[in-house]
From Swiss-Prot:
SUPFAM superfamilies: F1F0 ATP synthase subunit B, membrane domain. It holds the Pfam family ATP-synt_B. It is a single-pass membrane protein. It is found in: Cell inner membrane. This is ATP synthase subunit b 1. Belongs to the ATPase B chain family. The keyword Cell inner membrane applies.
Amino acid sequence: MNINFTLISQAMAFAIFIWFTVRFVWPPLMRAIENRQKTIAEGLAAGERGKRELELASQRSGDVVREAKQRASDIIAQAEKRAAEIVDEAKVAAREEGDRILVGAKAEVEQEVFRAKEVLRQQVAGLALAGAAKILRREVDEKAHAELLASLKAEL
């Protein structure tokens, strides 16, 4: 064996191996590496997009929460206002009812006073008649002296 032949055959085998590797092995490896780089780049871009979307969603949720709080405070204010109106309406209604009851009671008292005065007038007229009868020692006829009794009632 000649060392030159061995060296040349090894160099040719190495050259064939390099050619085979460059021709058939290297392109799929490069495609796999490029695909992996694309996947990583897309993942990073998606992560950035997700981060931006998360920030936007956080802002939107904050806006929604603020709006909901504002609406809630508006609703509470309206409810308090309506409650105050209802209380005022109830006070007015109660005052009107009290006034109506007071007017009715005053009218009833006036009627009772009038009735009591009438009863008192009749009793006084009866007493006056009895007193006059005792003074005159005779009985006074009510029919005959109706005019006298009417004027006596009017004076009382």
